């Protein structure tokens, strides 16, 4: 049994969906009605990710969806709301955001790979194997930092590499749960360093 009951999960999904929709409606004033289509797409794919007749997460699409819905869409939409345009220069930052957040999904799928394989959940780690999952975790974090060479997120790399070494050493089991917290902290640090680097570059 998991830590969260199905009823609590449904309640949590409903509350977070309503909160996200409320925030999105507030942004329509600044970004225009076209943002409504973006919001609807986000809600639709959030549902299709693990629900519906063919859950995308069970078909190995999770990592690609993270790049789109945690990278290109939020970064692009944020830029659009503030400037009214989405220049091509936004793409590297958007990809970096998607890659660094994907490290959390990769680690989660790495931890659950054996159970996922038994239940028919064909994540990228299940399809490619544990060693490939370890390499993807390392590459995603380092790739995100490489896309921001002129900015501060390079300081994130040593922490990410240290987390990767622990991941390889642990291999499997509940001890990987603590590494999820470490990876989340590293993602937060990456975001703060990126924001600070952009702010300093504009000075």
Model-derived features: positions:
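Cytosolic, membrane-interface loops and tails of multi-pass inner-membrane proteins
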Residues: 1-4, 105-130, 164-178
